[in-house]
Amino acid sequence: MDVIDPDRIRELEAKTGHDVIAINQALEEILSDEAKPFVNMGRTSADTTQTAKALQLKSALKVIATSIENLRDILLDKSIERKDIVAMDTTHLYDALPTTAGRPFAHYAEMLQSGLNHLKYAYENSLIGKWGDATGNHHAATVLGLDGMQLQETYCQMLGLKHMTASAQTSGLEYEADVMYAL
């Protein structure tokens, strides 16, 4: 998918007025003549758009996770730098018990790590691609003599995405909810 220029897709979409047609046309431009007739066979708009959304989220989660990891590491460094500095902790805006100036930094670093764990789960389990036709039953693949489930699995693996084993026209929103919760 990296060989398809997003600017080319936008250019084609401006001409066609349809995002999926533009993606299919961009795919056809890079495929062999033998493969071109099959670009849209057995796929629906939802197959294309949901897979594209998963790929966008995959890229975004990488950027977000890297930023959070960097911030966590900075906080851990600050925690270590301040571990021997005595400070007064507070509760309800009143002085409480002595602590170190580094403890709050370590606390926030731990909270960020918890968020990273949620992001990692969403990244590894909730980015769903599909290629299953209008009902998710892979009828068109069967007509072509292909194993539709294997086609979908291979397609999604090549993109670094998970796939549903019992798909429908659209995948459930639970997967997107996992990602939103993690964020």
Language-model segments: residues:
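Catalytic cores of enzymes that engage adenine nucleotides and/or redox cofactors via long glycine-rich
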Residues: 142
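Active-site-adjacent structural elements in folded domains
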Residues: 163-174
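Metal- and O2-centered redox machinery and metal/ROS homeostasis
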Residues: 158
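A helix-coil-helix interface module used to build multimeric assemblies
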Residues: 1-138, 146-154, 163
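A conserved active-site cap/scaffold subdomain adjacent to cofactor or substrate pockets
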Residues: 172-183
